[in-house]
């Protein structure tokens, strides 16, 4: 019911910060997504979001949503299955039996939060393995060298477009490709993946804009 007032202020673009389901206390402000198809219960439902975007459009207001690409919450169904030993689920992330490969990465990859979350990997006691966690230990990096990851994340992106989101802001997109011996930032493969996403969106939802965080 506040949209007419927002419109009267001259607003024609609303940027929604992360609002998808994420675990309380381990949500990084919503950037640790546990379910890409559900809204945080305290904010409402996906149907509420559809109603909101529809009303925004009636008011001439475009809607932008942060879409977290680099990682999922450790509570995501893929991560839970990986923790339980599912090899297919583990292939969606970066799992290692020991610290040998992670330590090679650490030689060239800078820390995002050196004080609050030092390092880029976390030991998972439940499965006695190391997983890549560039941001926080509860945010597991996705492996975009696995085609399933790209396909499913594009599916999640298109799902949000079908909910009425006009602009998809690709959060942490420079981090999505990992390669030993590099800083794992803004590598050429990142640009290739984003171009592929752009091609797909131009075919399926040409009115949707992709906005990359750089």
Predicted regions: what they are:
Residues 166:
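Receiver (REC) domain switch/active-site residues of two-component response regulators
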Residues 1-151, 162, 173-214:
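Acidic/aromatic-lined carbohydrate-recognition and catalytic surfaces
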